Amino acid sequence: MGLPWYRVHTVVLNDPGRLLAVHIMHTALVSGWAGSMALYELAVFDPSDPVLDPMWRQGMFVIPFMTRLGITNSWGGWSITGGTITNPGIWSYEGVAGAHIVFSGLCFLAAIWHWVYWDLQIFCDERTGKPSLDLPKIFGIHLFLSGLACFGFGAFHVTGLYGPGIWVSDPYGLTGKVQSVNPAWGVEGFDPFVPGGIASHHIAAGTLGILAGLFHLSVRPPQRLYKGLRMGNIETVLSSSIAAVFFAAFVVAGTMWYGSATTPIELFGPTRYQWDQGYFQQEIYRRVGAGLAENKSLSDVWSKIPEKLAFYDYIGNNPAKGGLFRAGSMDNGDGIAVGWLGHPIFRDKEGRELFVRRMPTFFETFPVVLVDGDGIVRADVPFRRAESKYSVEQVGVTVEFYGGELDGVSYSDPATVKKYARRAQLGEIFELDRATLKSDGVFRSSPRGWFTFGHASFALLFFFGHIWHGARTLFRDVFAGIDPDLDAQVEFGAFQKLGDPTTKRQVV
């Protein structure tokens, strides 16, 4: 039978044993990829600076997912939060990777066994002696088991009752750690940034899944519904499964891109909207304002700003700045961050404090414009010097740094002032090492961007797959040219008027 490549799955259409085999093999491939990818990432990951060179800057993709579920230690003696450890235990990063690879091998062997021994008694219909699957019962079994797993995850793993808990952090991604979470049963549980909602929703959804599974195991579908939804056709299962997968993919693409308690910024990097809304900048200025209200000096209050918070307020960490087809980690783009130079404050010769307008997300170049506290333009770096009125030289702009490596240093040289004004467009100013990785200076996206793009793309593809297979199973008889009234239509003289079923001849 010469099947084209896009129809090869036809061979398992009426073969339950080998249908099971190919699904087990698929699980083996997925699990094997996850374990292998984890080992590769651990081989290239540098845990030495969790503040300025975190996992998301290094382009780690599977390590963040392990970390948010409670894995923080490595057999290499390091912890993701910094420092060294002596007893990481079996459930370290390497332990999880190894477990996936072992599981992959077992699934591989099981798939081969089920491929060879495909003609099992369990798949045989006693009445007909032909291979058959009781799909409604299988649906009930899967619903019950997945509900059990969902409930167990929410009630035991997340709450810490039997498990480590999950990664929980503050709104600014500064104090993150793995901890147990109490379920949030009030309206606050519907806030996507409240970790307690993860526990309560898994418990609730798991309970519903268990009850629904038991219902489908004990109640048979009505005949009309069974036939109407084509419940006896395996392609119905394929269509509805694809629907579940694409719906989940759309949901997680949204929670990843817009941010939620399930996608902490310490593990996946900031969202683009935190740059667009000046989220971290506002918090920095709030802290500075609070310090100044206590009569502390500018140098003191800016020195108290956590380097981690300042680093979030840098456009190079915006996932929307990197092109989708620019391969490599963020570190391969603008370089490895070495240190915060401090916060630059610009002043004109009249002593007014000036603020550099920040570059919007979707600009590659942007004019350097300095405004005062009222938003009035006071200085710029002109495109045409002959017509300039507000150039740094004419206005006499100076810059002084507070906090960071250049604390207390000031510059009045126009070339230096303009250099730092340009860099201030990109947020807080950092020293970046571009030599180590031969970084090219072109911004890259973070794993947050890759995950969103991948899942949104596949969700769209799977949506069309759902429509395709759903239509095939619902209209299978029509596509095959089989119509319930076909025999009556072609019978000579069946209708008084050819093809008009309302004029059926009466038998005398």
Curated annotation (Swiss-Prot):
* BP-aspect Gene Ontology terms: photosynthetic electron transport in photosystem II
Keywords assigned by UniProt? Chlorophyll, Chloroplast, Chromophore, Membrane, Photosynthesis, Photosystem II, Plastid, Thylakoid, Transmembrane, Transmembrane helix
The UniProt GO MF terms for this protein read: chlorophyll binding; electron transporter, transferring electrons within the cyclic electron transport pathway of photosynthesis activity
InterPro entries the record matches: PS_antenna-like, PS_II_antenna-like_sf, PSII_PsbB
Q: Where are the transmembrane segments?
A: 21-36, 101-115, 140-156, 203-218, 237-252, 457-472
Source organism superkingdom = Eukaryota
The answer on whether this UniProt entry bears the keyword Thylakoid reads yes
Write down the membrane topology: Multi-pass membrane protein
Q: SUPFAM superfamilies, alphabetically?
A: Photosystem II antenna protein-like
How is the cofactor bound here?
Answer: Binds multiple chlorophylls. PSII binds additional chlorophylls, carotenoids and specific lipids.
Q: Which residues form a coiled coil?
A: none
Q: Which GO terms describe its cellular component?
A: chloroplast thylakoid membrane; photosystem II
Q: Where in the cell is it found?
A: Plastid, Chloroplast thylakoid membrane
Quote the function comment for this protein: One of the components of the core complex of photosystem II (PSII). It binds chlorophyll and helps catalyze the primary light-induced photochemical processes of PSII. PSII is a light-driven water:plastoquinone oxidoreductase, using light energy to abstract electrons from H(2)O, generating O(2) and a proton gradient subsequently used for ATP formation.
Entry similarity comment: Belongs to the PsbB/PsbC family. PsbB subfamily.
Q: How does it assemble?
A: PSII is composed of 1 copy each of membrane proteins PsbA, PsbB, PsbC, PsbD, PsbE, PsbF, PsbH, PsbI, PsbJ, PsbK, PsbL, PsbM, PsbT, PsbX, PsbY, PsbZ, Psb30/Ycf12, at least 3 peripheral proteins of the oxygen-evolving complex and a large number of cofactors. It forms dimeric complexes.
* Protein name, UniProt field: Photosystem II CP47 reaction center protein
Q: Which organism is it from?
A: Ranunculus macranthus (Large buttercup)
UniProt gene name: psbB
